[in-house]
Amino acid sequence: FKGKLKIIDEQKHLTAINILSLEDYLLSVISSEMRATSSAEFLKAHAVISRSWLLAQIDKAKTVRGTYSSYRVDQDEYIRWYDREDHAHFDVCADDHCQRYQGISKAYTPAVREALEATRGEVLTYEGTICDARFSKCCGGATERFDNTWEPVVHPYLDKITDAPEDLETGDLRNEQTARKWILSFPPAFCHTTDRQILSQVLNDYDQETQHFFRWQVSYPAEQLSELVYRKIGIDFGTIRDIQPIERGVSGRLIRVKITGDKKTLVIGKELIIRKTFSESHLYSSAFIVEKQDGIFTFH
């Protein structure tokens, strides 16, 4: 790691804080999020996006205090959205919660530093403001609106786009039947590739361990699912009997889902809490359908 190391006592734990320049930070980020062997233009684009995101968060922290995650809880709904929660003593953390930052050992090609030098100081802006640039490794063929995923703020530059060479016709993915057809299909999206040469060029080894990231499925017996949901969000539904889509975003991602158990029925959202609720870690996406057969819930 570059820079200086600061150790502080934070709530009876020691916290290590790495103090370094923006560009040294980005040197690690763009080779931790993606691989240092990625093409030059890919690395340049990543540098601009990651620089923009970081500066937007720092600027936001100057004006917004308290938590960056919010709740709306009543007897019928549990709605939560996450963002970069307020790190009181540092700007960003070192994992996917903010951006991956794994030190300079990942930046083992000259192309990484060259990409930073070529884009030094460059950011994305919209109407004079630095963009809150978000990114993912695989969008499943279509991206979602910012306000459907995070806080209810509309950013016109973060809207639905299709990830394809030409405008891929998806239909209205807010419609359940259209979304179902889309989710069960394999459209010709850029991120739909099994080419090992491409994947090994742009993904670090730990990301290549995931084989089925474009379309996937996971199954749970009802008893296991009920225990998992109780453990993840602390709400006792009893035995879960049904999971129903209530609202989907423009990309088909679920924003609100109704869980029906023999003790309780509740609607949960937004996107990330849905993904966390139905997985030990998190589902790859909330663009899924649920099928039930013989007491087994299968998420596609």
Locations of regions flagged by a protein language model:
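Conserved, single-site charged/polar hotspot
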Residues: F1-H300
